[in-house]
Regions:
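Surface-exposed binding patches on compact interaction domains or structured appendages
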Residues: 36-56, 76-127, 132
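Terminal connector regions
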Residues: 131-164
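Predominantly extracellular beta-rich ligand-binding scaffolds that present long acidic/polar faces
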Residues: 279, 306, 311-432, 459
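C-terminal motif of bacterial Sec signal peptides marking the signal peptidase cleavage site
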Residues: 30-34
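Buried hydrophobic-core signal for structured, non-transmembrane domains
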Residues: 68-75, 126, 140-149, 266, ...
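Surface beta-loop-beta hairpin patches that serve as ligand-binding interfaces in beta-rich domains
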Residues: 434-476
Length: 476
């Protein structure tokens, strides 16, 4: 003890030590006095302030949970208050509520004696999952969160719309199945059209795909949309945060050996690879895929990907995809008439051109490659948006005519290079042509050819004798 005392004597004189000891005693007593519990007062005249009077969810597919939404309740009083009860009104209904709430971090559909400090706030988190019923059209699902103090109550309304659907989950589809627009189609974990079978998708059909889901086709795919009622394919997250997010689902995959595909009036968005074509027909002169009046937009990797395929496309718009809008690899034959391939004003960091084509050898065999591009637009923010890779041993032949191409290389038949086609509003994904566009009335009249497919444009407007280049006709 003497050692301890002597060790500190030179640091703290006796008088100073006494004062420090006294100060410590005072602090202890102050601390004890400050440990009184906070008081929370129940008040029948309490007036809570709500951040909103309604929480609105977008239309939800039945069985699919919503995103979590939140709102706040404020205590504007200068004292702590006690809320008698916070509860979900529909909890006592038969079958319960479609909604779930979390009260300031506590998952519960009802809490009593909820404390709220002076000039503080309370978080309420809300989710909803809607059960199916017999309705074909969207239906309303409501509830409310109620706050009760004494005789006073305040309620925040919860509003969502449910949409029934037909669900498929990791299955081989019935042979020669037809999907129609009676109810939306929802695909979980992918589906397969078997060899020798055909899937027909009628006009106006909406198809929603869960994350990482694909439509695989070993047989034949027939998409029969119309300009007024296109077939729509999307991811199944419909809320604003996710509905325009690229990579929300995989895409259509036309497998090797499949053939006879016809795609009319399809609006496909937000996939990973929009349409992938692996098919190599036995007859080298046949066509795997015919595409007409189709839009492919905002795919995370490639809009249209083809391996040694044969594709004819008319009035097709492929826009703002992550790596390529179109990529043809290991050769193939590709004929595009009145098509637009464009990448502008997207959130992607781009390191690849809009349009790529390669004759790479496959299994040490040459891959002949043929490209026809007529009355078309290939445009983007890079200096060279059309790249032909001739590293393979197969021949490459091209027929490029009456087209505007953003390219460093002058290719035979290209009408204009480095000439901005002046899209009307690309920031809003409007790739129609502005009034003073050099693409206006610069095309060759193809209306009498190719089965009349080019008499009208992507949105069914009549084409002029001197047509606008690209998928969309400029109407004066």
């Amino acid at each position: 003890m003497r050692l301890f005392s002597s060790a500190f004597a030179h640091i703290f004189p006796k008088k100073a030590a006494f004062h420090l000891f006294g100060a410590a005693i005072i602090i202890v007593f102050l601390g004890v006095g400050g440990c009184r519990p906070e008081r929370f007062v129940a008040n029948a005249d309490l007036e809570l302030r709500c951040e909103t009077d309604t929480v609105l969810f977008d239309t939800l597919l039945v069985g699919a949970g919503s995103i979590t939404k939140r709102f706040k309740i404020y205590n504007d009083e200068g004292r702590n208050i006690l809320i008698d009860e916070v509860y979900l009104a529909g909890r006592i209904q038969s079958g319960g509520s479609a909604y779930r709430i979390n009260i300031n971090g506590i998952p519960a559909n009802a809490l009593t004696e909820v404390e709220l400090r002076a000039r503080d706030s309370l978080y309420i988190f809300v989710e909803v999952t809607i059960d199916p019923n017999q309705q074909n059209t969207p239906f309303l699902v409501t509830d409310s969160v109620v706050f009760r103090s004494g005789n006073r109550t305040k309620a925040v309304q919860l509003v969502a719309y449910g949409q029934n659907a037909v669900f498929f989950n990791e299955e081989v589809l019935d042979c020669n199945m037809v999907w129609d627009n009676t109810l939306p189609i929802v695909v979980y974990n992918s589906v397969l059209v078997d060899s020798g079978c055909t899937l027909t998708i009628r006009e106006g059909t909406r198809v929603y795909f869960n994350k990482n889901s694909s439509l695989f086709v070993e047989g034949t795919l027939r998409i029969e949309g119309t300009p007024a009622q296109p077939v729509r394919m999307r991811g199944d997250r419909l809320d604003p945060l996710y509905r325009d997010l690229a990579g929300g689902w995989n895409g259509i995959h036309l497998l090797r050996g499949s053939t006879g595909h016809r795609i009319e009036n399809l609006d496909l968005r937000n996939g990973t690879i929009g349409i992938r074509v692996d098919s190599l027909p036995a007859d080298a002169d046949s066509v795997n895929v015919i595409i007409n009046k189709t839009r492919i937009h905002n795919c995370a990797v490639v809009g249209l990907l083809a391996y040694t395929a044969r594709i004819d496309a008319y009035n097709m718009l492929v826009s703002n995809c992550g790596l390529y809008n179109f990529l043809g690899d290991y050769g193939g034959r590709y004929r595009f008439r009145h098509c637009t391939f464009v990448h502008l004003n997207s959130g992607f960091q781009r390191g690849y051109p809009v349009f790529g084509l390669s004759n790479r050898d496959y299994n040490n065999s040459p891959s002949p490659t043929h490209l026809e591009l007529e009355n078309s637009l290939v445009w983007g923010s890079r200096s060279n948006e059309l790249v032909l890779d001739s590293s393979g041993s197969g021949t490459i032949t091209t027929l490029l005519s009456y087209s505007i191409i953003q390219s460093e290389t002058q290719r035979p038949g290209v009408q204009l290079r480095y000439t901005n086609p002046k899209f009307k509003n690309p920031s809003d994904n409007d790739f129609s042509i502005d009034t003073l566009s050099p693409a206006f009335q610069r095309g060759f009249d193809l209306r009498g050819l190719y089965g009349g497919r080019l008499q009208t444009d992507l949105i069914d407007q009549a084409r002029a004798p001197s047509p606008t280049l690209g998928a969309l006709e400029r109407i004066e």
